[in-house]
Amino acid sequence: MAVTVETLDKLERKMTLSLPVTLIQSEVDMRLRRMARTVKMDGFRPGKVPMAVVARRYGDAVQYEVLTNKVGEAFTVAANEANLRVAGRPRITETQGTAEGHVTFDAIFEVFPEVRIADLANVEIEKLSTEVTEASIDKTLQGLRKQRRSFAQRAHDAPAQDGDGVTVDFEGKIDGEPFANGKAENFRFVIGEGPMPKEFEDAVRGMKSGESKTFPLAFPTQYHGQEVAGKTADFLVTVKKIESAHLPEVGEALARSLGSADGSIEGLRADIRKTLEREIRSHLRARNRRAVMNALLANADLELPKASVQDEIARLKANAYADLKQRGVKDPERLEIPEDKVRPTAERNVRLRLIFSEMVRAHGLRAKPEQVRAYVEELAASYEKPAEMVRGYYGDRRRMLEIESSVSEDNVTEFVFARAKVVARTISVDELLNPKDPKD
């Protein structure tokens, strides 16, 4: 087999493969003889069809299959021998004017780039930490009590205040005209907890049962309802009922309702601590990994294979269509998703994948079996039957590949932190679990 490799662009290569015709033909003949032993044709007994007839019927298809396989095998062998790390599938075409006795093909493909990362010792990265305090346990316990609160109707002349459940009728108009979803009857919400806009809550706060009020409400320009985004509506609201909240007492009944085995508040607080510590580990892992990702993106130099980017664009679009379909949109593929809308995300994903892959390869950071086991056991610990969950994880190959990848990313994160300029910052549990910036 004769092979030549030519550089076409930074990452694009052309490999010319020349295979002996005899190699192809011998494989074709062998397959046709094998087919002749079992093929069925009208006018012939099974296994008695002449080779010439079998060749006329199936020869072209068999030759195409053999050529495809042989060229693919030859390409893989040649790429490995040349130490080429191929990105994506090659585009293979047969060339004209080939040498006598040989068939020649050109394979156009891309290779993975060299990844150059700046000296990590000069890279500054923030690393977050936190710890569970008695105050964070108190706040969580208060939240659990609120989930189990009851409401009782307040006196007719009592004004609505934060924490009250209010039932209202409302109607909004823009320039005197009603708009979609701008009207409701017997709508109930809790003041201070959404989902109503702050201006709406401010208007209702202080009103009494039976009172009505008209007030303006300016919708933000980024409001999800495009019909009203950036416009000001006049709302008429009537309060029909006000209810005050009553939290359950902190005692044995509450503890047992929340799953405390012994019914003690001490046991409940211990359970809350354990849950918070598990959530903290997960959130810190994600936040610190993201900080490392951003630092590597800013300090790595590499070319992106076009094929990899196009594959990622296709994957993102397929995921978007699947999400729309799950939300009840019929035939979501008819909705055009412009490529330029997903390209930045696709390029970022490919860049990160290449950087992490190179870090794992260059520094031996592939997930070890014991690390994977510890990660799986941590995931399973929150379930009622952890051992069954562990077996379930190990029985799901796709899920295990995701876990192995996640553990490898954790290894990269720790590797980078060990070598970079780390700026340590301690934050509260609430800041970690309920960040103001949704990107966190």
From Swiss-Prot:
SUPFAM superfamilies: FKBP-like, Triger factor/SurA peptide-binding domain-like, Trigger factor ribosome-binding domain. Involved in protein export. Acts as a chaperone by maintaining the newly synthesized protein in an open conformation. Functions as a peptidyl-prolyl cis-trans isomerase. This is Trigger factor. Consists of 3 domains; the N-terminus binds the ribosome, the middle domain has PPIase activity, while the C-terminus has intrinsic chaperone activity on its own. GO terms for biological process: 'de novo' cotranslational protein folding; cell division; chaperone-mediated protein folding; protein transport; protein unfolding. Gene3D superfamilies: 3.10.50.40, Trigger factor ribosome-binding domain, Trigger factor, C-terminal domain. The gene is tig. It comes from the Bacteria. Disulfide bonds: none annotated. Keywords: Cell cycle, Cell division, Chaperone, Cytoplasm, Isomerase, Rotamase. It catalyses: [protein]-peptidylproline (omega=180) = [protein]-peptidylproline (omega=0). Belongs to the FKBP-type PPIase family. Tig subfamily. Residues 163-248 form the PPIase FKBP-type domain. Its EC number is 5.2.1.8. Its main location: cytoplasm.
